């Protein structure tokens, strides 16, 4: 591996943070448009999640992968409960704002210091947690955010069809 002055890593981190933030901005726009009642509605499909639950799950997966696994913060997580979560748009938007800010700090810390808590367990990811790299963790979080943004967009579409 060629030696660098660190600018490539800084550019990579900036690109990752920008991509994650674009997902968060799209999610918050959708949540803001839905309001308190609609954000908690589930589409009429077996196993479907509400918009609130989808975004809440994204907050929690980011906190776990970056904060707990990556930085060793031991943040509590109830993964099964994430999909039953309900609440107001204001509280959800506040939590998203906090995790967006934390993501910057946690990502930079994890990339610089390495993964802090490989023994943490609260994921269903099919990855070898003993060998994943900090870069893999960042890309995994972005992948999950993008995937769940698509799920959120489809959820809103299905709710619209169900009410027409």
Enumerate the predicted regions with their spans:
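Short, contiguous alpha-helical
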Residues: 1-4, 13-28, 33-82, 122-164
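Generic cytosolic/nucleocytoplasmic N-terminal low-complexity/intrinsically disordered segments
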Residues: 2, 7-8, 108
């Amino acid at each position: 591996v060629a030696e660098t002055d660190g600018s490539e890593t800084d550019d990579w981190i900036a690109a990752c943070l920008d991509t994650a933030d674009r997902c968060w901005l799209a999610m918050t726009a959708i949540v803001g448009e839905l309001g308190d009642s609609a954000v908690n509605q589930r589409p009429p499909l077996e196993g479907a999640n509400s918009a609130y639950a989808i975004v809440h799950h994204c907050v929690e997966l980011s906190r776990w992968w970056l904060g707990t696994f990556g930085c060793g913060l031991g943040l509590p997580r109830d993964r099964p409960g994430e999909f039953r979560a309900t609440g107001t748009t204001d509280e959800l938007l506040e939590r998203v704002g906090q995790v967006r800010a934390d993501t910057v700090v946690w990502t930079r810390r994890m990339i610089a210091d390495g993964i802090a808590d490989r023994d943490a367990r609260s994921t269903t990811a099919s990855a070898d947690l003993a060998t994943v790299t900090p870069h893999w963790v960042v890309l995994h979080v972005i992948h999950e955010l993008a995937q769940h943004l698509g799920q959120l967009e489809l959820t809103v579409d299905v709710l619209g069809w169900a009410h027409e």
